Amino acid sequence: MKAIQGYHLIRPEDLHWRPSNLMRIPNADYLERTGSENIGARLWRLPPKSANTLHKHIRSEEFYFVLEGTGRMRVGDETLTIPKYGGVLVGPEQLRQVFNDTDDEVLWLIVGAPEELEFLQGSKSKMDLSLIYPVDPKQLPNELAGIEWPTKS
């Protein structure tokens, strides 16, 4: 992995918001245009009564930081409540899932390193997705029982 040279300024208008593949959560990748191979950073805007994937990483640590609202998160067998401007560092191999069981949007900044290059566009190898999704990634936490997410459009 090579380090970038100099710096990259990222303005809010540079961000491209799109729904995530599995759970349709709006997100914007801060570093996709920088070419960084060492770190990843995304904004995730969780709508009310929604959840992101239940997953883990092979070698990446992730720092979850709540920018707006009150964050809720499953880490292993625990459910955490993270206040605005609070954060959680999660190591690799630890199953995790951010979710929103409130009636308001929650905005997260999630930063991970090292970047897992096998997921980058143009990767030469096929990734074994069972390594990051050892269980059904779309399963919702008990706090969202009876909720359908992602919603059918």
PLM ranges: what are they?
Residues 75-76, 84, 99-100, 119-121:
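Short glycine-/acidic-enriched loop or helix-start segments at secondary-structure transitions
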Residues 89-90, 103-122:
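A short hydrophobic beta-strand segment most commonly corresponding to one strand
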Residues 54, 73-74, 90, 96-102, ...:
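Short beta-strand His + acidic residue motifs that chelate non-heme Fe in jelly-roll/DSBH
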Residues 77-93:
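Short acidic-glycine-tyrosine-enriched beta hairpin
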Residues 43-47, 56-74, 111-114:
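Short, conserved beta-strand element in jelly-roll/cupin
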